[in-house]
């Protein structure tokens, strides 16, 4: 028996979910896309074998960024394009988190306070790396928002892939070898200050909304108590790993860029009421265990992580900012004496891409091994 998928879970439990909850327009769109992905609802490419006449139908995917069936190719294409941005230099992985007491307010103001996470994280890196006490150079970094923990609970945090060196004001290359050059205590202090300053400014200018468990923070005294608690709490950014070299960086990036709240391979079992899936227990050094929750709760948790409309989740800063990226990276390569790594997939058609990535030849007939002609009929539809 095949393992259940996210699509299967939505088919079984989404009607019951709707009796209890009201999804946002973006959540409803994600559900509609997931339910119809690769079913024929979005059309199909129909190919005919030139030798035996056999017909093969390939159903189109939904391409929704929350769909677990639609992330593999976009991830590979994005990773391939980023090859040209990677230098032969150390890289570090930083994670910025906020106290979980802020979660209700953040969820009520997702776009606003997700943006605040990016602003605070990027401003922290820029301030500390430009300080001669730490590095005194302009670095490049990519920030990626994740909003989930292993159990699909709401846990907004920023993953940052940081170049371990940069250009000084005199356009000289400077790094600190493989040693991480920013004190964690300094990152924590500066990040907390910048995030809280922006949060308080949003409150003072009446830009925040409060729903659900965040309703109480409409009250000035309750909000002030929340702010005080945040200053008292530990803000724990951390550096996860040091790595070097193009392939290491690209592979590492791919683990985070197109990840969604849960992938199909983590789902173990589904019955008429519950869903069982694997989670990491970080209290036991990341050991895997099984968690069983109701199907309705599974959908509620999954939909918490549908991003706001047109929200940009992967953002580039510093040397990787598109306005000056080519010029600055070229200078860095010249100073480091390293070559530019070229894209392997650019300008290639999908059959070539699939063959190169997965050794799948979609131009070969499954019936006779003959050659499939180009799709003769396309049936584009939108649900």
Predicted regions and their residues:
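Beta->alpha loop/short-helix hinge microenvironment recognizer with preference
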Residues: 1-383
């Amino acid at each position: 028996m095949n393992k259940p998928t996210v699509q299967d879970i939505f088919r079984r439990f989404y009607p019951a979910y709707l009796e209890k909850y009201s999804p946002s327009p973006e959540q409803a769109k994600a559900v509609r896309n997931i339910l119809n992905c690769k079913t024929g609802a979005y059309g199909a490419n129909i190919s005919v074998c030139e030798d035996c006449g056999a017909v093969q139908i390939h159903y189109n995917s939904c391409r929704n960024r929350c769909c677990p069936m639609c992330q593999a190719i976009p991830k590979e294409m994005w990773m391939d394009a980023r090859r040209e941005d990677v230098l032969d230099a150390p890289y570090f992985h930083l994670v910025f988190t906020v106290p979980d007491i802020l979660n209700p307010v953040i969820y009520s103001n997702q776009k606003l306070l997700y943006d605040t996470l990016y602003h605070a994280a990027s401003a922290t890196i820029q301030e500390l790396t430009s300080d001669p006490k730490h590095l005194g150079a302009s670095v490049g970094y990519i920030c990626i928002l994740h909003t989930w923990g292993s159990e699909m609970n709401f846990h907004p945090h920023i993953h940052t892939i940081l170049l371990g060196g940069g250009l000084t004001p005199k356009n000289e290359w400077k790094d600190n070898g493989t040693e991480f050059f920013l004190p964690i205590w300094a990152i924590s202090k500066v990040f907390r200050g910048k995030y809280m300053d922006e949060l308080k400014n949003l409150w003072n200018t009446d830009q925040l909304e409060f729903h659900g468990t965040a309703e109480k923070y409409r009250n000035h005294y309750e909000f002030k108590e929340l702010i005080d608690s945040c200053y008292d709490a530990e803000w724990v950014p951390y550096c996860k790993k040091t790595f070097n070299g193009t392939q290491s960086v690209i592979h590492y990036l791919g683990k985070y860029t197109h990840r969604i709240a849960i992938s199909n391979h983590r789902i173990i079992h589904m019955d008429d009421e519950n869903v069982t899936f694997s989670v990491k227990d970080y209290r036991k050094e990341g050991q895997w265990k099984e968690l069983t929750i109701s199907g309705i709760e599974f959908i509620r948790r999954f939909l918490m992580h549908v991003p706001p409309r047109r929200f940009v989740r992967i953002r580039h800063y510093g040397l990787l900012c598109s306005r000056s990226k080519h010029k600055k990276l070229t200078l860095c390569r010249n100073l480091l004496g390293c070559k530019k790594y070229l894209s392997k997939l650019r300008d290639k058609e999908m059959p070539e891409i699939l063959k190169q990535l997965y050794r799948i030849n979609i131009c070969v007939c499954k019936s006779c091994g003959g050659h499939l002609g180009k799709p003769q009929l396309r049936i584009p539809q939108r649900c």
